[in-house]
């Protein structure tokens, strides 16, 4: 595992348990989508992970492809239909692209699967470049709401579940360079 990826996981764990008033007894993070894959797993330009903490589960991002997260979960014998909450880190399609297909497929098994989607306030705002909206996630909002998704907006640090927190909106200091 490369150093950058290890540092990311360490940072994510610090965010999850670092702001807590209690102590997490059981924490597990399972990566379902990343650029690195082998054996029976699919890789893609995207990210998704299940965070499990003391009996609570939340899907952190949904990858970019329609099938990557669900196929990798199936390969790991993970039942995604029992995960009701999704946390979207930001609006890029490599972190949100799988959400519509996950909701469509899993709601037939469990109507609450992937139903509650935690997002930062302003995630659906237009991002204009040369007069065009380049925020692809904006176009997904109506589709997701028609599938029964309820968005939960966060602006400041908040506890989502016991010992699972969001930092809230992280201000952008510099324009994106990629």
Predicted features, each with a name:
Residues 1-24:
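Bacterial Sec-dependent N-terminal signal peptides
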Residues 23-37, 93-101:
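N-terminal-biased segments
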Residues 25-27, 53-57, 158-165:
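Beta-strand-turn-beta hairpins that frame and shape the catalytic cleft
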Residues 28-75:
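Conserved beta-strand hairpin/beta-sheet module of binuclear metal-dependent hydrolase folds
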Residues 34-36, 62-64, 91, 121-123, ...:
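Active-site metal-binding loops of divalent metal-dependent hydrolases
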Residues 38-39, 66-68, 93-96, 124-127, ...:
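Active-site environment of divalent metal-dependent phosphoester hydrolases
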Residues 67-118:
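Active-site metal-binding motif and surrounding structural segment of the metallo-beta-lactamase
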Residues 120-178:
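Metallo-beta-lactamase
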